[in-house]
């Protein structure tokens, strides 16, 4: 049985977080005063402390993560690695695998269809896919981060927004390609600690047909497009501040700063399609959340010590992971 990422955009957008996302308010007119630009930290940084979830003598230590993080930061991971080495299990964020009986050459044959799926199915340019006001906002951000790119104008709004967001992060010395999980995974492997990845598997009988169906499906993705633009227009300095706060271990700043995220809105645009619904993907985020909580329950029952990784925006809030763990009767202590 081979695994094949049928909807790479879904996996990227939906599963960085498993709880409901905070919405981003529509952009306000830019102030006439100049705001000082936040400088992004670099070099060796300690990172934050861990949340402690406990019952009796069993502890679950949760490292809250932030995305993006400073691109040129090196995390001083020794303290957490030593905790992993003393623990019985390392619990990852929930993940999804799309399983299909597809061989190597068959997967290669699917690439052209997957590439076509990035573009608007009716061939209309981006300008005709979104409102005039929204397109003007797009042009401002495009000029800033993408320059004169013409190919991007063929993309679906959700794909264009994703590319714009990636380039904006890079230009601001931020990155979503962090090595946090990689470092902890290597530590667990080195110390023979059990690693658990809570997984939801989607079975796809005919990936070629599914991709073709997706390529001809019109998405309701203007909200994703607008939310991404708003994030870049209004949240970039806070984004840097959150990244810096994580790097230097300022937990209070992480708690105080807002955590807007456009990925939930963008994921909804993809998961609401008929092609996703027919294949059991419409409630995927709820499935992933439930699977992680189930794995956490099991770890707390059988292990004296477990280390877990979870996005901070998924941990916090009335409907966050920490609230769910409190409802289950666990004691939750914030990092010092």
Per-region residue spans from a language model:
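Short, well-ordered alpha-helical scaffold segments within catalytic/effector domains
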Residues: 4, 77, 289-293
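Bacterial N-terminal signal peptides
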Residues: 5-14
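Short hydrophobic "helix-edge" motifs at membrane interfaces and signal-peptide entry regions
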Residues: 6, 54-56, 301-302
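Boundary at the C-terminal end of the N-terminal hydrophobic targeting segment
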Residues: 18-22
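Structured, acidic catalytic/metal-binding patches in enzyme active sites
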Residues: 24-41, 47-280
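A cross-kingdom marker for long, charged
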Residues: 270-336
């Amino acid at each position: 049985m081979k695994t094949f990422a049928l909807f790479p955009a879904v996996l990227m957008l939906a599963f960085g977080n498993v709880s409901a996302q905070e919405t981003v308010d529509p952009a306000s007119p830019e102030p006439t005063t100049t705001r000082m630009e936040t400088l992004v930290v670099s070099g060796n940084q300690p990172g934050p402390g861990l949340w402690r979830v406990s019952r009796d003598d069993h502890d679950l230590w949760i490292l809250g993560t932030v995305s993006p993080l400073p691109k040129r930061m090196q995390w001083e991971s020794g303290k957490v690695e030593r905790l992993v080495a003393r623990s019985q299990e390392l619990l990852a964020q929930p993940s999804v695998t799309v399983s299909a009986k597809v061989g190597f050459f068959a997967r290669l044959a699917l690439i052209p269809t997957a590439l076509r799926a990035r573009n608007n199915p009716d061939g209309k340019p981006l300008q005709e896919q979104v409102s005039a006001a929204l397109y003007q906002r797009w042009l401002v951000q495009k000029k800033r981060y993408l320059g004169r790119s013409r190919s991007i104008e063929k993309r679906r709004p959700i794909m264009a927004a994703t590319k714009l967001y990636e380039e904006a992060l890079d230009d601001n010395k931020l990155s979503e390609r962090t090595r946090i999980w990689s470092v902890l995974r290597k530590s667990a492997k080195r110390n023979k600690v059990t690693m658990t990845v809570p997984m939801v598997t989607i079975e796809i009988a005919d990936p070629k047909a599914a991709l073709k169906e997706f390529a001809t499906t019109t998405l309701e993705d203007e909200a994703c497009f607008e939310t991404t633009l708003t994030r870049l227009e209004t949240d970039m300095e806070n984004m840097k501040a959150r990244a810096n706060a994580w790097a230097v271990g300022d937990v209070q700043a992480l708690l105080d700063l807002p955590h807007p995220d456009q990925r939930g809105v963008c994921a909804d645009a993809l998961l609401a399609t008929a092609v996703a619904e027919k294949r059991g993907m419409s409630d995927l985020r709820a499935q992933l959340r439930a699977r992680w909580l189930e794995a956490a329950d099991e770890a707390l029952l059988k292990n004296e010590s477990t280390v877990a990784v979870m996005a901070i925006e998924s941990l916090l809030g009335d409907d966050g992971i920490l609230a769910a763990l409190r409802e289950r009767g666990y004691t939750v202590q914030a990092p010092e």
